[in-house]
């Protein structure tokens, strides 16, 4: 019996997921460059901490902390990724000394004025989508598997996404997202991949382009650190107001 596009798509997604298992935790410093439709830019500096959760019923945890400029210093987003249920996300606003829970209906909103939605910042767990293999295609002159995936979790701002995963190391190269009406919404590109611990690949240059507004957000990563002293206590909601 011929392999179905759905089964082939799931196999590719599963292999990409398998290759990134076991990293434990990571930290990285990032520069965020916001560009408006007129080409004007503004910059921010932030840190991202990630804790791998090896349970089948829960996804990874992530903490994003802004360091510059001063007016958003200390602003933080804590994400507990779920598998098929809505992710848990909390935004800490230092000026108000208040932690705000991000509801499912607000996860499609822009994260602190960027082109990334809140849901873009959760880990991309395998079971969050159904998949369909489309074919093989070059992406930035790299041989890739082209796949379509459909979010099955509540509140997604996307009806579907086209993804390109390279054949060499199963790394995401591009995600093209469509809004709930089926119109082209955003394109996320992954570039400058570097390998850590001889196993784990991380893109150091990500650009999210809004195809409807002409705005974009670029993230430039410095060197990642893996298997640090991070633990569950660093990702507790109650710790948000004590961040440094």
Tell what function each PLM region has.
Residues 27-29, 43-45, 61, 128, ...:
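Broad gene-expression machinery/nucleic-acid interaction feature
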Residues 30-32, 64, 131, 149, ...:
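Preference for bulky hydrophobic residues occupying beta-strand positions
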Residues 123-130, 136:
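Surface-exposed beta-loop interaction hotspot
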């Amino acid at each position: 019996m011929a392999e179905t596009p759905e089964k082939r798509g799931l196999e590719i997604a599963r292999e990409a997921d398998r290759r990134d298992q076991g990293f434990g935790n990571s930290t990285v410093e990032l520069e965020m460059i916001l560009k408006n439709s007129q080409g004007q830019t503004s910059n921010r500096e932030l840190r991202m901490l990630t804790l791998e959760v090896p349970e089948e019923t829960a996804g990874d945890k992530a903490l994003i902390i802004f360091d510059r400029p001063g007016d958003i210093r200390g602003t933080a987003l804590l994400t507990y990724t779920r598998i098929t249920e809505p992710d848990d996300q909390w935004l800490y606003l230092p000026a108000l000394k208040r932690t705000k829970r991000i509801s499912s209906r607000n996860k499609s909103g822009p994260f602190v004025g960027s082109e990334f939605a809140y849901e873009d910042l959760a880990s991309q767990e395998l079971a969050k989508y159904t998949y369909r293999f489309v074919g093989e295609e070059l992406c930035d002159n790299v041989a890739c598997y082209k796949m379509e995936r459909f979010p099955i979790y509540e509140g997604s701002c996307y009806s579907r996404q086209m993804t390109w995963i390279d054949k060499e190391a199963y790394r995401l190269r591009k995600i093209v997202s469509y809004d709930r009406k089926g119109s082209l919404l955003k394109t996320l590109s992954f570039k400058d991949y570097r390998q850590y611990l001889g196993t784990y690949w991380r893109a150091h240059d990500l650009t999210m382009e809004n195809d409807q507004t002409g705005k974009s957000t670029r993230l430039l990563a410095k060197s990642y650190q893996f298997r640090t002293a991070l633990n569950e206590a660093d990702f507790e909601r109650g710790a948000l107001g004590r961040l440094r």
